[in-house]
Amino acid sequence: MYKKYYSRFLEASDFLHFAAHSHHYWPDVTREATLEAWDHAATTTDLKWKKIMSEVFPKTQRHIAKLINFSRPEDIALAPNTHDLVFRLLSCFFEQDKVKVLSTDSEFYSFARQIKRLKEWDKFQVEQVKVDDSFIENFVSKLESNKYDVVFLSQVFFNSGKVISNEDMDKIIQAAGNATICLDGYHSFAAVPVDISKWEDKIFFTSGSYKYAQGGEGVCFMTLPKDCQLRPLTTVGLQSLVT
C-alpha cells in the first residue's frame, strides 16, 4: 500500500530494512522537495527568500502546529537541527553567575554531549535523574525541593521507549515553578499522539522531521511560550527566529 511512496529507497537496496528507531526510509517527496529547493535557488538567487519566508515557512509552521495542537503557528522557530535551538535556549542563561539544570540520564546524544560539556564550566550545576520505575516521583521531588533555571527532559526516551504521560507532565510543570522547561519531542513527534495545548505557554517543545515525521533531514522546530522575553547570546532573541 505504501511502497509506491518509497520507490527511490526501495530501488536502491536489495534487502529488507527494519528500523523501529534508526534511520528510516524517506518517501520520494523528500527528494523532490530537496531538488525543488535547489532549482528555486538557481532561478531566483537572492530573491529566493521571498517565497521561503512568505510561503514555505508559514505553511511548515501551520502543519507542525496542527500535529501538536499548538495555537500560534507564528511562534514556532525553525532550524536545521534541535541542537541549534536548544543551545540558543541555554545561552539565554550564560550571563548568570550560576545556572542550575535538572535533566535525566537518558537524553539523546546531542543534548547529553552538550550538557556534559557545559558541566565542565563552573557556571553550570547539572543534576540528572535516573529514568527508572520511580523516575516521576524522584524528578518531581527534586523540583519541589530545589530551584532550577532550566528543566530538560524527553517526552519519549530514546533508549527505553518510556513515555511521559500528560498527567506526569502536569505534575512536572506544577513542581517546576518558574523554571524554563524544554520538552524534547524528537522521539514522540509523529510517533505517538502529541497535544501540547495545555502547556503551550509554559514549555518549549522541540522536535524535527528526520525520524517518524518522514520529512528527511534539516527541518527542526521549537515552540515558544507566549510573550517569551528570553534573549539568547547566539541571536537577538528567540522571537526573531520566527520573523
Q: Over which residues does each language-model region extend?
A:
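Pyridoxal 5′-phosphate
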Residues: 1-243
